[in-house]
């Protein structure tokens, strides 16, 4: 049986006393691809923000690789390899494409490996290589989504 990577149990999130997410439960095992699907306002983004430490939990627990991550902040979770690709474009528009990719590797200290990983991102997303020194704000929406995915992958989730 594949290892459980993420386990969400009884997740609850509230905004100013209003219950935005109540009782969400699921597991993600190694090798699985999971989507959160629902109507506008159903709590999909709120759930992801709670998992990645950007929103506090009102109840429940979240385990990553068998350990509770409840109450940990986003940078602590990135260091453990848990990242989220934003629903929107989520790029730093006043930074170059290369600088955006480097932000994904910010927590790592191995410069040689980072250089190899940037080259790998340019292989996966060749359109980014062509414009690597341009500001991310000059990119189309689809290109910005590619960049956001590349930046998330640079953190080696």
Predicted segments, located by residue:
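Helix-to-loop junction immediately C-terminal to a conserved catalytic motif
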Residues: 52
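ABC-type ATPase nucleotide-binding domains, specifically the catalytic core motifs of the NBD
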Residues: 16, 34, 72, 97-116, ...
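Short beta-strand immediately N-terminal to the Walker A/P-loop
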Residues: 34-35, 84
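Conserved ABC transporter NBD signature motif
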Residues: 60-69, 80, 113-118
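ABC ATPase C-loop
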Residues: 152-153
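Conserved structural motif at the start of ABC-family nucleotide-binding domains
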Residues: 6-8, 21
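The feature captures the beta-strand-to-loop junction immediately N-terminal to the Walker
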Residues: 37-39
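Conserved ABC ATPase signature
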Residues: 135-139, 143
């Amino acid at each position: 049986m594949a290892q459980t990577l993420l386990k969400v149990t009884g997740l609850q999130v509230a905004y100013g006393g209003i219950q935005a997410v109540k009782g969400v439960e699921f597991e993600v095992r190694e090798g699985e691809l999971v989507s959160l699907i629902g109507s506008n306002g159903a709590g999909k983004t709120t759930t992801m923000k709670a998992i990645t430490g950007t929103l506090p939990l009102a109840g429940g627990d979240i385990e990553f690789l068998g350990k509770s991550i409840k109450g940990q902040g986003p940078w602590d979770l990135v260091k453990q390899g848990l990242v989220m690709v934003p629903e929107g474009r989520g790029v730093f528009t006043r930074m170059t494409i290369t600088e955006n990719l480097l932000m994904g590797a910010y927590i790592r200290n191995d410069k040689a490996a980072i250089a190899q990983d940037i080259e790998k991102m340019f292989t996966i997303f060749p359109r980014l290589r062509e414009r690597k020194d341009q500001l991310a704000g000059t990119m189309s929406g689809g290109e910005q989504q590619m960049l956001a995915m590349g930046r998330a992958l640079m953190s080696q989730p």
